Amino acid sequence: MRPNGARTQTAPPPAAAEGTADVHGNGEAATIQLDGQPSAPSPPLTTVFEATDDYKARRRNLESEPPFEVRAILDDELSDYPVAAPLDAVPQKHSCCCGVCLRRCAFVLTGMAVGMLLAAALLATIAAFAVPESVWTGGVCERGWVQHMGVCYKPGRTPPPSSAADGNFSAATFAGANTNCAAAGGSIVSSDQALSFLVLLSKTASGPNSAPPRGSWWTTHSGSCAIVHYAPSSTLEVYGNTSSLQSLALRTRDALDVSIAEDTQCSGSAGVMCAAAPAPPTALKYAQALRAILTLGVRAE
């Protein structure tokens, strides 16, 4: 029994017997467990890696290279992109060297011409058989000619009045009339043609500055020369209320003094009036000729 207040002191366990030895061979001491007793923990070992020459070279290369962004900018600046240069600095390329361009242009133009000719021939062939028969007999008058009743008329020389009292006119002889009409591309009108055309001119001459074609005109009648004297007259007739200007009407009544005077010697002078048949257009002429050629070919077969 222990009296109250007495303390009991426990003796520490006996220390284990330890020894040290140079195990690693580098001068460091290591704890060796003796007699199966646990030893004190040894300090941590430090592992040291020694870099090779290859690794050192790669590291130096990486450290010497700039960052990726800088390298991207440098690569873009050093790239071989086309740069706009002044015209003087760029050598001009002569594409027409040795006539290559000229031959190419000539080939293209020749092809276009051949294509146009083939298209024109095709259209002419279609027109040669598609145009009705009535068109072949008609046509148009040239500029300066007036078409009336299927005939082209042209006054070669208008007869000027020699005397206002008698209304006689003088222009040219019959030979001169023939010469004028031949130069204009026609011939002297017949008496029937002259009357038809003069009536038309009289009806259309209704303006203040125009006058009916009064006068004498050379014509051909029954195979001989003749003169037609044309003298129309106008009368003013009043219809309805005379107080209104709208009720006035001007009518032309032709009083034809047709004196077809056959002159065997064709002497004297008169006005010149030419007549010609209307000619079909040029394209229609080619189509008509092509139609005739093709028709002959079909008949020959």
From Swiss-Prot:
The keyword Hydrolase belongs to this UniProt entry's keyword annotation: no
InterPro entries: CTDL_fold
Pfam family, one: UL45
Chain positions covered by the region annotation Disordered: 1-27
Major localisation: virion
Membrane topology (Virion surface): 132-301
Keyword terms: Membrane, Signal-anchor, Transmembrane, Transmembrane helix, Viral envelope protein, Virion
Segments on the Intravirion face: 1-110
TM stretches of this protein: 111-131
Signal peptide: none
Biased composition annotated in UniProt, kind: Low complexity: 1-20
Cellular compartments annotated: Virion membrane
UniProt KW Membrane keyword: yes
Bilayer topology: Single-pass type II membrane protein
GO cellular component: membrane; viral envelope; virion membrane
Function, in words: Seems to be required for glycoprotein B-induced fusion.
Family: Belongs to the herpesviridae HHV-1 UL45 family.
Protein name per its UniProtKB record: Envelope protein UL45
Species in which this protein is naturally found: Psittacid herpesvirus 1 (isolate Amazon parrot/-/97-0001/1997)
